[in-house]
Amino acid sequence: MISILRRGLLVLLAAFPLLTVAAQTPHDVVQGTTTELLGDLKANKEQYKSNPNAFYDALNRILGPVVDADGISKSIMTVKYSRKATPEQMQRFQENFKRSLMQFYGNALLEYNNQGITVDPAKADDGKRASVGMKVTGNNGAVYPVQYTLENIGGEWKVRNVIVNGINIGKLFRDQFADAMQRNGNDLDKTIDGWAGEVAKAKQAADNSPEKTVK
């Protein structure tokens, strides 16, 4: 009897972390990830400034589990191109996409000096899709809006899109991918291998857009 109880307790303890993750709300996911990321950044910022690879590994470790990289990659390619891609091409694009995005946008995190971040309650949570807003205070004191779209995938909420300061990142990258495919004569490998340059162009386009602050 004791042996059965012990085994039952071990099973319960092993399953508890999974139950905890599954029970997280969209707000919990965004708030928890933000808190962990900023805590790690505060402790290791100087190291990350001199070691970009360590910074990428940290971002991937913290953000990877809560980002729907597969869904985002297919969305950027759109059905037109993703259905033609081999599993190897999709995997390569995912890796190039994640690394280039974190490299180009990670610099903004290194410049963050605890000015202030507020995560709003989730909106339109129907159990499958939800939106979570965030307000980020810049160095100049202005407050910028960020909007996360999350989807429930297998009982876990994962980020599917982000709107930063009024700029829809998913749409921006979709347009950039389609334009690159045109310029590359529909050569999927060439577009995938040159994706870092496309992210740089997208970032420049975003940087040149008018700023939208929260009043």
Curated annotation (Swiss-Prot):
Keywords: Periplasm, Signal. The keyword Signal applies. It holds the Pfam family MlaC. Residues 1-22 form the signal peptide. One of its GO terms (cellular component) is periplasmic space. InterPro entries: MlaC/ttg2D, Tgt2/MlaC_sf. It is found in: Periplasm. The keyword tRNA processing does not apply. Plays a role in toluene resistance. Belongs to the MlaC/ttg2D family. This is Toluene tolerance protein ttg2D. It comes from Pseudomonas putida.
